Amino acid sequence: MSSAPASGSVRARYLVYFQYVGTDFNGVAAVRGTQRAVGVQNYLEEAAERLNSVEPVRFTISSRTDAGVHALSNAAHLDVQRRSGRPPFPPEVLAEALNTHLRHPAIRVLRAFRVPSDFHARHAATSRTYLYRLATGCHRRDELPVFERNLCWTLPADCLDMVAMQEAAQHLLGTHDFSAFQSAGSPVPSPVRTLRRVSVSPGQASPLVTPEESRKLRFWNLEFESQSFLYRQVRRMTAVLVAVGLGALAPAQVKTILESQDPLGKHQTRVAPAHGLFLKSVLYGNLGAASCTLQGPQFGSHG
């Protein structure tokens, strides 16, 4: 579970789950140097400085999210070596200490666990699930309730053809070369991914939104599960499925796009905005019940 450096103190590795509203951040990854933009990781590592570790604490993030993307539950591992031979922090104490010293109210550490010294938060993940939220019937931005702004993609259409979207989604299931849904020029060893689950279902407004405010709006949830995704793959798949829901594409055309394996095709102009996307969960098969899956009630589905 740990290594014993020459100083006599113990270096302990932890897995931490954390959540954030991504609106104010330049993504989850730390921004180094003199840039004014700041990532979620910058704040986490700043809080970790107060742990007084022998070595600077660095977070290795499981799943990188872009600017404006949110996380109900992301994960990272970190090593902490206390001074003067003190024993490692209990996980719950570590989580509480990080939250105490976090300087941004849109970030919160959820839980922490001790893990083996060779555990890797990114490589060990067995499942990642993303949620994308849509709101239809919103013809102007000022029609969207305050407590839904920057938390969903608004569409002026009154409704989506959910049956057609569900039919189109079936073409994406399974193991495929997803080159057509990755950003052109994104270097990856292989564009092949296995999409284990994709769902399209009615959603609901935040419980902070009054019935009168949401009377003309309809909410929709898209969920995607895989061990890993290509850069912006989820946002591009979402945009294509929305095009099907609006009648701009037929369900069969999604299969054609997928099989084209063309990252420069006309469909590449379709990218869903970042603010509707949430990293919902990151799971680790070897941790069993330790994996932390959270879903706020405002993001649930009916039925």
UniProtKB/Swiss-Prot annotation:
> What is catalyzed by this enzyme?
a uridine in tRNA = a pseudouridine in tRNA
Instruction: List, in alphabetical order, the GO biological process terms annotated in this UniProt record.
Output: tRNA pseudouridine synthesis
Active site residues of this protein = 66 (nucleophile)
Q: Provide the E.C. number(s) assigned to this enzyme.
A: 5.4.99.-
Give residue numbers for the modification (Phosphoserine).
84
GO cellular component term, pick one: mitochondrion
* Keyword Isomerase on entry: yes
One MF annotation (Gene Ontology) recorded for this entry: tRNA pseudouridine synthase activity
Does the record carry Transmembrane helix as a key word? no
Q: Which of this chain's residues are annotated to bind substrate? A: 130
Keywords for this entry?
A: Isomerase, Phosphoprotein, tRNA processing
Pfam families in the cross-refs: PseudoU_synth_1 (PF01416)
> According to its UniProt record, which protein family does this protein belong to?
Belongs to the tRNA pseudouridine synthase TruA family.
Protein name (Swiss-Prot/TrEMBL): tRNA pseudouridine synthase-like 1
User: Could you tell me which species this protein originates from?
Assistant: Homo sapiens
